[in-house]
């Protein structure tokens, strides 16, 4: 298939000319072979996801700020995860809702770069936050350094690493190492997975190693060690003193699994189109993993509230005291 590559104000855009001839410029009009109702459905979906995410994650951050009992190293990391999810929805969710409501990326180049960078950056911050959470569980239960306890300053250093490291590996496309480009459906922006350029491929490979494989490897290692520890210690010896830690560990596992369920399809899709950039995919099919990944920002705070008795108790107390 004849493939046309277009650069619009620094944002690269690949399209199959046979399919998308009516609108070579993604900023001036929608894909004409898709009925308007497709974009209306996506706009409605993004409105619901964005609204729920903003409300839920703001509630988690507000509760942690209001109740001193929740200001613990573990909760600092979870609040950081909520902040990342909140910012993903505030930037990417809002822009995606507006562009789908219009049917094309009418906001122009600056918004494309903003959405592409923001969603990628905050998404990777969330991924690395889960990796730090898994390390916190490993540190607390396995005690690799003996009686050394994890304190607030240690959590702060971990979060500083998360934000700095994520920024280092998501900012390069803004300055020319790869690019943030309009997606096939024309209403969202993402890293340029479809590029044939070897230079761009070096970034994509580096990005996957540092922002997906490394944090996932850290999660697998920490929970592998954690399971070994729990198997060695009998239920009687673990006792009631360790019961809260086991509950928190289960909560973190559920959060990690839920996040991976949301983002793994998008990661797999990105690998496929990077390896086969000329592959033809229906725009709706190509967009599905990206839109599905945004649901991760909705269910993480729900898991946190319902599986953490301390948080649910404080929220219930706050609600009924106001009532």
From Swiss-Prot:
Principal localization?
membrane
| Similarity field | Belongs to the G-protein coupled receptor 1 family. Opsin subfamily.
Q: Which InterPro entries match?
A: GPCR_opsins, GPCR_Rhodpsn, GPCR_Rhodpsn_7TM, Retinal_BS
High-level lineage: Eukaryota, Metazoa, Chordata, Craniata, Vertebrata
Q: Which SUPFAM superfamilies match?
A: Family A G protein-coupled receptor-like
Transmembrane portions of the chain: 39-63, 76-100, 116-135, 155-178, 203-230, 251-274, 283-307
Q: Which residues lie on this side of the membrane: Cytoplasmic?
A: 64-75, 136-154, 231-250, 308-323
Cellular localization per UniProt: Membrane
Q: Which residues are glycosylated?
A: 200
Read off the PROSITE patterns from this record.
G_PROTEIN_RECEP_F1_1, G_PROTEIN_RECEP_F1_2, OPSIN
**Sites of N6-(retinylidene)lysine modification:** 294
What is the disulfide pattern of this chain? 112-189
What is the name of this protein? Vertebrate ancient opsin
Against Gene3D superfamilies, the record matches this protein to:
Rhodopsin 7-helix transmembrane proteins
**Please, which domain of life does this record's source organism belong to?**
Eukaryota
Q: Which UniProt keywords apply?
A: Chromophore, Disulfide bond, G-protein coupled receptor, Glycoprotein, Membrane, Phosphoprotein, Photoreceptor protein, Receptor, Retinal protein, Sensory transduction, Transducer, Transmembrane, Transmembrane helix
Give the way it sits in the membrane: Multi-pass membrane protein
What spans does the record annotate as topological domain Extracellular, numbered to this chain? 1-38, 101-115, 179-202, 275-282
Q: What post-translational changes are documented for it?
A: Phosphorylated on some or all of the serine and threonine residues present in the C-terminal region.
Q: Which GO terms describe its molecular function?
A: G protein-coupled receptor activity; photoreceptor activity
Q: Name one GO biological process term.
A: phototransduction, visible light
Give GO cellular component annotations, separated by semicolons: membrane
Question: Is rRNA-binding one of the keywords UniProt gives this record?
Answer: no
Coiled-coil stretches, from where to where?
A: none
């Amino acid at each position: 298939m004849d493939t046309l590559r277009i650069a619009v104000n620094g944002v690269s855009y690949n399209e199959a000319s046979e399919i998308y001839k009516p609108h070579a410029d993604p900023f001036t009009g929608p894909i004409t072979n898709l009925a308007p109702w497709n974009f209306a459905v996506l706009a409605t979906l993004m409105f619901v996801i964005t609204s729920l995410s903003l409300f839920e994650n703001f509630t988690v951050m507000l509760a942690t700020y209001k109740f001193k009992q929740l200001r613990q190293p573990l909760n600092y990391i979870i609040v950081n995860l909520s902040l990342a999810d909140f910012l993903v929805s505030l930037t990417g969710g809002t822009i995606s809702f507006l562009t789908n409501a219009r049917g094309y990326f009418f906001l122009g180049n600056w918004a494309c770069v903003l959405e592409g960078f923001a969603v990628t950056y905050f998404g990777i911050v969330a991924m690395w936050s889960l990796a730090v959470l898994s390390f916190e569980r490993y540190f607390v239960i396995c005690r690799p350094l003996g009686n050394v306890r994890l304190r607030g300053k240690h959590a702060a250093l971990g979060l500083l690493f998360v934000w700095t490291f994520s920024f280092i590996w998501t900012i390069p496309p803004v300055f020319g190492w790869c690019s943030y480009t309009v997606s096939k459906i024309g209403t969202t922006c993402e890293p340029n997975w479809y590029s044939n350029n070897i230079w761009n491929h070096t970034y994509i490979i580096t990005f996957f190693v540092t922002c997906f494989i490394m944090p996932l490897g850290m999660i697998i290692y920490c929970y592998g060690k954690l399971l070994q520890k729990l198997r060695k210690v009998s239920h009687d010896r673990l006792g009631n003193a360790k019961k809260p830690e086991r509950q928190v560990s289960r909560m973190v596992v559920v959060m990690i699994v839920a996040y991976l369920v949301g983002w793994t399809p998008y990661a797999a899709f990105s690998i496929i189109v990077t390896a086969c950039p000329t592959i033809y995919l229906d725009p709706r099919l190509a967009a599905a993993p990206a839109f599905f990944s945004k649901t991760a920002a909705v269910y993480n705070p729900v898991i946190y509230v319902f599986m953490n008795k301390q948080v649910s108790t404080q929220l219930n107390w706050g609600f009924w005291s106001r009532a």
